[in-house]
Amino acid sequence: MAIEFGSRRETFENYKVYETMLAGRPFKVEMGKMCGLSNASALIRYGETCVMCNVVMSPKPREGVDFFPLNVEYEEKLYAAGRIPGSFMRREGRPGERAILTSRVVDRPMRPLFPKEMRNDVCITMTVMSLDPDCSPEIAGMIGASLVTAVSDIPWNGPIGGVQVGLVDGEIVLNPTQEQRKVSDLALTVAATMDKIVMIEAGANEVDEDTMLNAIKAAHVEIKKIIEFINRIVAERGKPKIDFQVVGLDMDVFHAIQNKYLDDFKAAMDTDDKNVRDAALLPIMDKIAEEYPDLTAADLDLVSYKMQKFVVRRWLLDEGKRVDGRGINEIRPLAAEVGLLPRVHGSGMFTRGQTPVSYTHLRAHETELHL
């Protein structure tokens, strides 16, 4: 006898499926069924690939940090490919190289669109629950991460979209299948907003510039369709963005410091010796610390960074020179030498300006080969 615990509509009042096509394959978004305590959640279905995407934010800003604490996690589960972990304990291992790189690919286009002044912890998680080799879980995860962040109440200037582009027999292919990727002369990932390209990652086999440009343009056309799809969902389910607490340097104070000490910073930084430059900046920062006792150590570090950045930028744009006096087309003095160490197979040192890098080379014995 079948037992009915209630219809889906009764159990999940806000459950809804949104559908579109992505590169000729069905793309579905399920919302309102899972992870109700997160700021936003969605199950992304691209072909038979399923990726659970969630975003959460801490209610209060983290103290003692001078950066936006964003954490992007792309998690691969072996069960998604029908496999069981091979370890003795049958547990999932640490993230692989592909998972780490995918987390970075998603992080890069999303991070700049968050408010720089926000200090609340934000965690975006993408969990691959089912894998279809022909439907990229990385792209599904990127779109899902963008979608849930846009729908959530977390301040963010998105959304973004992303696609992969291949080149098979001279033809541009969006989100190529597994077989197409094997013979493709181009492995390109593009992320963009509605107006601008924000991230490109590419590997290619001698692809000319015109072909690469056409591939990027084709990607952006498809991405615009994705963003329109996301915007329709946001218009229906989007939450009002919260007002976050600004923690850190008061910009009115910084502008006052900038107006008073700009010439001092220019004079201190006008040298090609980093040690001399750092020593000249110390008394200036001591004066600022005495004049503004309410500034924390983190605030003072930020003042120093922002002032130096402003001076370097103005020199580049207004005078065409760099901080060490070099022109835009000049490079630092280079030096290289080899044979520094007697008991290794190879060694050397490469120096550029005041930055030396040493290196060693060893050839392992045949008995130490990885089988």
Model-inferred region functions:
Residues 31-33, 43-117:
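N-terminal cofactor/phosphate-binding cores enriched in small/glycine residues
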Residues 40-42, 136-149, 153, 339-359:
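Conserved phosphate/anionic-ligand binding catalytic regions in large, soluble enzymes, centered on
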Residues 250-337, 341:
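Noncatalytic alpha-helical scaffolds and linker/capping helices
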